[in-house]
Amino acid sequence: MNQRILSTLGFDKVKQQLLQFIVTAQGTNEVSELLPIADENKIQSWLNETQDGLKVQRLRGGIPIPKLENIQPHMKRIEIGADLNGIELAQVGRVLSTTSELTRFFDELSENEVDFERLYMWREQLEVLPELNRQLKQAIDDDGYVTDEASPALKAIRQNIRRSEQTIREELDSIIRGKNARYLSDALVTMRNERYVIPVKQEYKNIFGGVVHDQSASGQTLFIEPKQILEMNNRLRQQQIAERNEITRILAELSAELVPYRREITHNAYVIGKLDFINAKARLGKELKAVVPEISQANHVVFKQARHPLLNPEKAVANDIVIGEEYQAIVITGPNTGGKTITLKTLGLLQLMGQAGLPIPVEEESKMGIFTEVFADIGDEQSIEQSLSTFSSHMTNIVSVLKKVDHQSLVLFDELGAGTDPQEGAALAIAILDSLGAKGAYVMATTHYPELKVYGYNRAGTINASMEFDVDTLSPTYRLLIGVPGRSNAFEISKRLGLDNSIIEAAKQIMDGESQDLNEMIEDLENRRKMAETEYLEARHYVDESAALHKELKEAYQVFFEEREKELQKARKEANKIIAEAEENAETIISDIRKMQLESGQQGGVKEHQLIDAKTQLSQLHHEETKLAKNKVLKKAKEQKKLKAGDEVIVNTYGQRGTLLKDNGKGQWQVQLGILKMNVSEEDMTPVAPQKEAKPRVTTVRSAESSHVGTQLDLRGKRYEEALAEVDQYIDAAILAGYPQVTIVHGKGTGALRTGITEFLKNHRSVKSYEFAPQNQGGNGATVVKFQ
C-alpha cells in the first residue's frame, strides 16, 4: 500500500489509537511497522490472533503484561563482554518474570480447555529460565538496587556500614546537643564529599579542629568534619568502597550469567511484544465496539452497520456498505454536507484496517475483500503547495490512479469531475467510471452532477446511492441509501424556510422537463423505499415473534417430556420396592414353613415344587421398564372390551400379567398377580388374550412325599441356565430334607458353570459356606455346600 493513501484515509491516526494500549517497547515497534498487506494467509493469521485477543479480553480481561523496556541494546552489550548496571538487569529480570507469568497464564487457560487459533503457538515459543529468574529477583529489586541478599559478603559489609553510620551520628549528636551547640549555625548533621560534617560558625572554626569540607554562600558557615570522627569517617569510607567493589563484582557475575541465554531472552522479549500487540488490538476492538471480519473468498465487501473508527462510537451513524456482490461501482449523488465523504473514507479505512489484521467497527458476519492497492482522490487533500487549481489537482491524482489500477484495486473518488464546466465534468466522470469498470476495479465515487444519476441506472454492475436528508428538520441524517439517487431538496427546503410558493412554482417551470422528471422519479423511489422498509420491519417483527414462540413451545414440550419420564421412573421404582418387600416377606414365610415341617416331622404339608414355583412367580413380578402405557392398540382394545372375572389383563403400572378375581365396584378390581392379590383401578389395566397352557415342567427336585433327595447333585452335561435353575430347586429341597451339607458336581470344563454356581451360592441366604471338594472326591470339579 502506498504511504499517501494511509495518511489520506486516516490509517496513521488509527495506529495512534492503538499505541495507547501498548505497554512494551517491542509492542511499540510492532505498531510502528504495521501496514496493510494483500497476502490472504498472513491476513487470516493476523485476524485469528485478534480474535484470540478478543476472547481473552472477554474471559480474563486481557493478557497480563506489565510495562517493559527495550532490552535489545542490553543483549548486544553483554554479547561483546560489557557489564549491565542494576537498572538494566532489573529490566531483563522483568522480561524473565513476565515470561514465567505468561506461561502459567496460558497453561491455566489450556487446562480449562479454552481454545485459541494462534495464542498457544506464541506461548510455546516462550523459554522459561527459572534459575536465572530466581538469581535476578534475589539480587536486584525492581528499581535496579542491588539487595543485601545478592551475596553474603555484601550483606556483611552493609551491616558494618550501618553500624559505623550509627556510631558517627551518635558522636555528632553529642556535639550538637551539648555545651558546644552555641558554636554551630544549626543543630544538624549533614554530608559533604560523602563525609559526615556539622555547620560551624566562621568565628569558631578552631573550636572543633578537624577538616573543613565546604562553606556557605555567605561564608559565615563552615562545614567541618570534627577531629573526633575523622577515623570513623575514614573507616566508613573504606567500607563504602568495599560495598561498591562487591556490587561491581555481583553485576559482572550476573551479566556473565545472562550471556549463554541472550538469544532466548531476546526472543522472549519479541514474543511478549507480539502478545502485547495482540492485546492492544483487542483493547482497541473493545473501545470501538469492533469485531473481526471474515475474508470473502469472492472478494466482496459486506460491511454491516459500519462506523468510522475515528468518530465517537456513540454518535457515529452506522451504515450498511456492500460492494462486489451485485455491483462493483457505487455512485453517491446529492448535495454536500450530507456525509458522502465520510462514507467514502469509512469504506477505505475499514478495508485497510482489515488488511492489517485489526478489528473493525461493524456488526458480526461482516466480510472484507483483499485488494492489492487502495486508491483515493479526496476533496480535502488539494495540492496548495503546487498552486494547482481544484480541477487540475484532482485530475493529476486521477491520471496517476488510472495508470496503476487493475481488477484487484479499490478506488475512491470524492466529487469526481468537480472544478470545471458541469457538462464537461460530468462527461469526464462518466468516461473515467467506464474506464475503471472495464478494468474490473471496485469503485465508490461521490458527485453532485445529475447526469451521473442516470448513469447508475444504465450501466451494468453500477448502482446509485445517496445520503438521506430530513426535510422536516432541514438536516442530513448521514444514512446511506443504496439504490436511491440523491436530489438537492432545494424546493422543499426553500418552502419550509418561507419562500413564496409562487416563486417556487416559477422555478419549477424554469427547470427543464427532463430534470423535473428525474427529481420526481427520485422522490417516488424514496417513497417506495420507505414503504418497503416499513413493511420489512413489520415482517421482521412477526418472524422474531414466531421464532420466540416456537422456542418457548419447544422448551415447554421438553420440560413436559422430562417430567413425564421422571414420574414414570418414580412409579417403577416404587413398584419394584413394594415387590422386593413382598418377596422378602414370602422368603421368610417359606423358610418358616420348612422349619415347622422339619420340627413337626410332617412330610405331607406344602409340596416343595409349589413353594419354589410361588417364589419364582413372585420374582417375576419385578417391573421391567416397559412402555406399555404408550401402547395405543392395547389402550383401544381395553376400551372396547368389558371386563369380567377370570379375564387376563396387563397391570400398566407394573407391566405384569394378572387375572381378574372380582369387581370391587367404582372401577376397582381385585387382581391375582402371581401369588399376590392386589386392588387395581380399571384405568391401570389393559385386557389381553389368555396365554396358552404351558407344558408341565420337569424338575429334578420333588416333594418329600414323592421323591427322595440325594446328598449329591450331578450337573455335568447340563446347559448353564438349566443347571442354575436346578441348583436353586435342589438347595431348597435339601434344606427341607434337613441335610447339613450337600455336594454339587459341575465338572471342570471351561469354568463358566463353576463360576455361575459360586455366584449363586454367595448370595443365597441359607448357605453358610462352600468350598471345592477334596482332591480324592473331585477337587475343583465339585463344590461342597454347608447350610445355616
Curated annotation (Swiss-Prot):
Source species taxonomy: Bacteria, Bacillati, Bacillota, Bacilli, Lactobacillales
Keywords, sorted A to Z: ATP-binding, DNA-binding, Endonuclease, Hydrolase, Nuclease, Nucleotide-binding, RNA-binding, rRNA-binding
Cited SMART domains: MUTSac, MUTSd, SMR
Ranges where the Smr domain occurs: 713-788
NCBIfam families: mutS2 (TIGR01069)
Gene3D superfamilies: 3.30.1370.110, P-loop containing nucleotide triphosphate hydrolases (3.40.50.300)
Protein name: Endonuclease MutS2
Source organism superkingdom: Bacteria
EC numbers on record: 3.1.-.-, 3.6.4.-
Function field: Endonuclease that is involved in the suppression of homologous recombination and thus may have a key role in the control of bacterial genetic diversity. Acts as a ribosome collision sensor, splitting the ribosome into its 2 subunits. Detects stalled/collided 70S ribosomes which it binds and splits by an ATP-hydrolysis driven conformational change. Acts upstream of the ribosome quality control system (RQC), a ribosome-associated complex that mediates the extraction of incompletely synthesized nascent chains from stalled ribosomes and their subsequent degradation. Probably generates substrates for RQC.
Family matches, as PROSITE patterns: DNA_MISMATCH_REPAIR_2, SMR
Transmembrane segments: none
